[in-house]
């Protein structure tokens, strides 16, 4: 790989642009020496390991170790830029406490729930797993086994896991941690369009005239995309940026329309904007008449709490929270008319002139607008509604599926889209938007997987929050966790999380690269390979699927999650997991292992070892004797081809810097549902929302409803949790990078200085954050990047020494079953 004069000039320009945008680049990116003869480095491409942006990086390897990473100049997503986390990618795999051997709780040489962790062989680890899983399956059946997976699984890891549980163990009790971050987005897409994932793409950033951030701090959480917004705003003076949040953060630095609103009132604000559009005759009537229908959703749907909770008992429509009925445009207009400027301003605390400025961005026919959101919408007890309601604004004005007009749901994990959603690792889903409750979908999955009819259960399994409750209640007893840190990430962990992990009736397995809070609560820890220690694939927020090769070996005895899943499947014969009447439908499966049935089925094992690129290692292919990643991917791709989820052939992704599906005849799709851009839209129709049988999108009439818990005299503050630029999720990787750790070593409680003064508190003092569920200690911060309004505190959750989720409430959106981490009531006590 050599550097031409043109490439050198281009790379220098990239470095200069990064400096202006406030994005740090490694020295190697500014002085891009890539001649392997000089450096003795082997450079290869990969997507970044962190967020759902999907930045491309180049990875340098020497002596079987990653020694450097750079932003990939050829990557369309980031065009050579890195954020500060991407800068230090080369260090995430080399923490001093990296796990390299299986660890089992032992006492006197035997497994003991109350024993100490001791190193064991993989054979001993799987022996105990096998014993525990078979015991539970025999005593209680498939509903007592489960798995909690991840939006950080590679595509084939998630696919193999879903297959093992839903087909092998016949249990739908598998859910990803994407339930915590993207489930409301999924339900929003499915309810409005009948298909998941955005219709637009990142190209919209260069075409939009206005950007509206609904509960998204892109400057810190999606900094590379923020540089594209910044570039558009600074180079096109008429471009406007509106930032809406419950507290001030770094994204407000660019805001032309800064809006601080009271928690939960974003629902009312969106109804006001819809009312404004209608009142001012700005509805795109031709688009609305041809391409939309109207429905009214049921209300009073509860908060996803335990059935005996008073709020749940009072909910009239908790049994079917997603129900709706058809209405007319006039009905919808009357519905939103209740949300006038005076009412919404009083409710939200937002001045009326600000509401009108915001509404005009959507109403003005000459303004192309992108709406962008992340956890502010999704982690919301009405998160599915919030997603539906922002689509209302784009559909009423016809500002959708064209360059610059895009309601865009941003993702937080590198493959929350590609693995959790597209593969269907949720407890109710199958690949390509299929669901377990649909008989035709189950039949199709069983056909592709060569299963006896009736293998896949017809009821959704336990979702993430319910898994914790069922572990606590002793109804879920054999449980495997991969690539997540739910003991730190889940709400109300002391009441609903930890008790289940330490329940004597349960056996908990955690696969991870580091001894996380979750791993330390388990009974068996399995050491996992990370990132480029295995061949992988991720799918990012713009439907872009990206591949990488294995570049280095995992340390010690660490093994990939894919190897763990498939190797463990060898421990079970069909007679151990399937009833006799099911086996009778496929008598040729008698005596076979789940590995034989699921992975050595003539499809997954179709591609021989000789097809593996000889320049790269592939530990899994070597272990199993065939190109397992290719086989899994091609079998999985069968679900979506011809159904609007088309993926390119496997080998194409190793050549490309990612492709955006649907990929038809080798061509990717940038804008879905629009004629001329989407191959599934018929000529002459203009637009087709073909996920719905009638080809039309749904505009929903949905109200404002209050949160599950609000401040009162005893607990006078709102608590909001979230992330910071330097750390990713629970910090299990970033806190092991010295530079990132030093930049932000510990979480703090961000508080308004006047609130602190009124309580006699000073910056830096130790305080206790207390809720009805628990408490945690931290230091008070009244300055810095995050500035809450009075009556609200913000606490990041990356710090394993300060478990803020001891305090949070495990209320969910009843439709998406996603937790609301943004709203509960607390008090602050000086220690």
From Swiss-Prot:
Known EC number: 1.9.6.1
Places the protein is found: Periplasm
PROSITE patterns: 4FE4S_MOW_BIS_MGD, MOLYBDOPTERIN_PROK_1, TAT
Catalytic activity: 2 Fe(II)-[cytochrome] + nitrate + 2 H(+) = 2 Fe(III)-[cytochrome] + nitrite + H2O
Major place of residence: periplasm
Organism: Cupriavidus taiwanensis (strain DSM 17343 / BCRC 17206 / CCUG 44338 / CIP 107171 / LMG 19424 / R1)
Listed cofactors: [4Fe-4S] cluster; Mo-bis(molybdopterin guanine dinucleotide)
Protein known as: Periplasmic nitrate reductase
Residues the record lists as binding substrate: 797
Family: Belongs to the prokaryotic molybdopterin-containing oxidoreductase family. NasA/NapA/NarB subfamily.
Binding of Mo-bis(molybdopterin guanine dinucleotide), residues: 85, 152, 177, 181, 214-221, 245-249, 264-266, 375, 379, 485, 511-512, 534, 561, 721-730, 805, 822
Gene3D superfamilies hit by this protein: 2.40.40.20, 3.30.200.210, 3.40.50.740, Dimethylsulfoxide Reductase, domain 2 (3.40.228.10)
Keywords, ordered alphabetically: 4Fe-4S, Electron transport, Iron, Iron-sulfur, Metal-binding, Molybdenum, Nitrate assimilation, Oxidoreductase, Periplasm, Signal, Transport
Gene: napA
